[in-house]
Amino acid sequence: MAATMFRATLRGWRTGVQRGCGLRLLSQTQGPPDYPRFVESVDEYQFVERLLPATRIPDPPKHEHYPTPSGWQPPRDPPPNLPYFVRRSRMHNIPVYKDITHGNRQMTVIRKVEGDIWALQKDVEDFLSPLLGKTPVTQVNEVTGTLRIKGYFDQELKAWLLEKGF
């Protein structure tokens, strides 16, 4: 870097014009520009608050009758007395999802299981066995609280969990 600066100085000495020095000298001699003052107003902050994301999802409104036209149904007020509990998602839906991997492996996933997940697995197998004619293939992950079932049974399992009171 020092060599390039030296060459540039020599070039400027030969031609009589020094390059790059004028801007540096100007920037060092001038003070900071005078910016206009600002006024802090709290009246318009309501418009800023509308843009900020909500910190939590609000509770769903009360309806006259259930299920609602969208098919949503609240959980039973006293939770069912079972050794396991399936917590609702943050949007207040039952956490049963379809999953497809490797292009054709169809799975149904029940998430947010708390408590005895093995009891839930046994109850799910008892529920799905008459529908399939055989015991479904399941996978339990105790750490993440998920139960995976081979095949698409999301609608049946959602209805079954609603019937149980989750």
Curated annotation (Swiss-Prot):
Species classification: Eukaryota, Metazoa, Chordata, Craniata, Vertebrata
UniProt keyword list: Mitochondrion, Ribonucleoprotein, Ribosomal protein
One biological process term in Gene Ontology: mitochondrial translation
Subunit structure comment from the entry: Component of the mitochondrial large ribosomal subunit (mt-LSU). Mature mammalian 55S mitochondrial ribosomes consist of a small (28S) and a large (39S) subunit. The 28S small subunit contains a 12S ribosomal RNA (12S mt-rRNA) and 30 different proteins. The 39S large subunit contains a 16S rRNA (16S mt-rRNA), a copy of mitochondrial valine transfer RNA (mt-tRNA(Val)), which plays an integral structural role, and 52 different proteins. Interacts with OXA1L.
UniProt name for this protein: Large ribosomal subunit protein mL49
PANTHER family to which the protein is assigned, alphabetical: LARGE RIBOSOMAL SUBUNIT PROTEIN ML49 (PTHR13477:SF0), MITOCHONDRIAL 39S RIBOSOMAL PROTEIN L49 (PTHR13477)
Family: Belongs to the mitochondrion-specific ribosomal protein mL49 family.
Location(s) in or outside the cell: Mitochondrion
Signal peptide residues on this chain, from the entry's feature table: none
MF annotations from Gene Ontology: structural constituent of ribosome
